[in-house]
Amino acid sequence: MKSYVYHSATATAHALIEHLIAMMEREPEKTFYFAFSGGSTPSLMFDIWANEYKEVTPWMRMRIYWVDERCVPAEDYESNYGTMRRLLLDEVGMPDEYVYPIYGVNRPEIEAKNYSTLVCRTVPLWGGFPAFDVVLLGAGDDGHTSSIFPGQEYLLSSFHPYAVSYTHLRAHETLANL
């Protein structure tokens, strides 16, 4: 595995975007399936992508999913989907039919089941599991990723792509992981 080190979050975002675009350029007939998480680094990346790479990105060959979501409406500033919608998707005119949000206002257990079904129906499967081309994760200061916090490692062995992760941070910050 290769490792890359960049001098800033901005440089990292540029490098990642350029890598993703190059990956898509190598297979011009392929549809690519992406799963994104939230947080400060993806927000920076979304803003840069919309403002500096809009014209060179093959948006119509991308299908957008989420790794996790908070149980809040899309309009809430803490919504991962809402953040990406405002910073990137609306800016580049991404058609709704290529965007598959987790609905944070639904009951977490029901939405985790519904989203698992949706992902398994719309993303190519490998060994019975969704085979995304890219899953972009971050890591919180407390060591969490994909809404899986220390002590919740049991979620990694779920038979479903998405499960509910109740956190210790805030009562509304709950759903889901890939």
State where each predicted segment sits.
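Ligand-binding beta-strand-loop-alpha-helix segment within the catalytic cores
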Residues: 59-136
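N-terminal glycine-/serine-/threonine-rich phosphate-binding loop
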Residues: 1-33
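Short, well-ordered amphipathic alpha-helices
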Residues: 20-21, 44-53, 85-86, 116-120
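Conserved small/polar residues in nucleotide/adenosyl-binding loops
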Residues: 167-174
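A short secondary-structure junction signal
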Residues: 112-113, 145-151
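Short glycine/serine/threonine-rich phosphate/pyrophosphate-binding segments
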Residues: 43-45, 144-147
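Glycine-rich beta-strand-to-loop/alpha-helix junction loops that act as flexible
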Residues: 36-41, 137-141
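A glycine- and small-aliphatic-rich helix-loop capping segment at beta-alpha/alpha-beta transitions
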Residues: 48-58, 82, 86, 150-159
